[in-house]
């Protein structure tokens, strides 16, 4: 569960390291986001010569959450931390590589480019 002010790690090579959620997209007064949801983030930490700079506002899709997510078969999946991948307006990833595993729920949300770049899909 991600809400406003939540800090997330960035799981791609766009150059951002840490981002903060500033808005959960999808519906009025929506409070929480989970795996596969698109959020608006502010970049809080970035490396030099990055595609994005500190202080920029971007969109991101959540790929890992520390809060468990229930699957249709009754099983649960959770990760060690909260991570996101930065995306552009066309929902394409800004980076060219994804680090760490991503959840299978992204496939149902049509984020096939992220699924194909990820080293492992759980």
UniProtKB/Swiss-Prot annotation:
TM annotation in the entry: none
GO molecular function, one term: large ribosomal subunit rRNA binding
One Pfam family named in its UniProt record: Ribosomal_L14
CDD domains associated with the record: Ribosomal_uL14
GO cellular component: cytosolic large ribosomal subunit
Keyword Repressor: no
Function, in words: Binds to 23S rRNA. Forms part of two intersubunit bridges in the 70S ribosome.
Subunit-structure text: Part of the 50S ribosomal subunit. Forms a cluster with proteins L3 and L19. In the 70S ribosome, L14 and L19 interact and together make contacts with the 16S rRNA in bridges B5 and B8.
Record's protein name: Large ribosomal subunit protein uL14
